[in-house]
Swiss-Prot record:
Family, per entry: Belongs to the nitroreductase family. HadB/RutE subfamily.
GO molecular function annotations of the record: 3-hydroxypropionate dehydrogenase (NADP+) activity
EC numbers, comma separated: 1.1.1.298
Entries under Gene3D superfamilies matching the protein: NADH Oxidase
Major enzyme class: oxidoreductase
Function (record text): May reduce toxic product malonic semialdehyde to 3-hydroxypropionic acid, which is excreted.
Catalytic reaction list: 3-hydroxypropanoate + NADP(+) = 3-oxopropanoate + NADPH + H(+)
Cofactors required: FMN
Protein's UniProt name: Probable malonic semialdehyde reductase RutE
Amino acid sequence: MAQILTPDALATLFTDARTHNGWLDKPVEDALLKQAYHLARMGPTSANCCPARFVFICSSEAKERLKPALSSGNLAKTLQAPVTAIVAYDPVFYDALPKLFPQSDARSWFTSSPELATETAFRNSSLQAAYLIIACRALGLDTGPMSGFNNAQVDEIFLAEKGWKSNLLVNIGYGDINKLYERAPRLAFDEACQVL
C-alpha cells in the first residue's frame, strides 16, 4: 500500500508550487532533464502507449528557431527560460506497443481506427505533460506550461523529420518568485465535483 506523502512534499508538488513567468539566470543540467523524464515516463497511460515525445530546447540557437512560432504574450518568458520542452506526440505511437504492451495485440486497436489513435495520442501525451511537470517539481525545478504558439510552425521547424505533432510547451528552470502573479483562486470541491 502506498504511503501518504509528507505535508512538505505535497506542498512542493501542489499547494506551494506555482506557474512561473520569470526565470533566474541559472542553467538546468541535462542530467536533471533526463532524471525528470525517467520519473515522468512511469506515469500511467492507456495500454502503456506512452505517445508523448519531448524536445528540450536549451541552446540560444534553438530558442531563436522557436521564436517565430511563439505568441507575443509568451515570447519574453520563453526566451528567458533555461529550457522549453516541446511536449509532442508520435501519431504512430502504436508501433511501439508490441514492446510496451506485449500481453495483447494492442497495436491493432489503433491501426484499425485513425480517429482513436489521434484521440489516444493527444489525451495521453497531455497526461504525460502533467507527469513531467510533477517530476520537475519533485526535482526542485519550476515550470510554466502554455499553449500560446503556432503548432504548425513548431511541427515544421522541430518535428517534421520524425513526424511528431506538438501538443503544448513547458518552460522549465528556476523561477523568479519576484515575477509571480498573485495566486488565482481555484474552484471549491462542491463547484467542481460530484459524489454519486
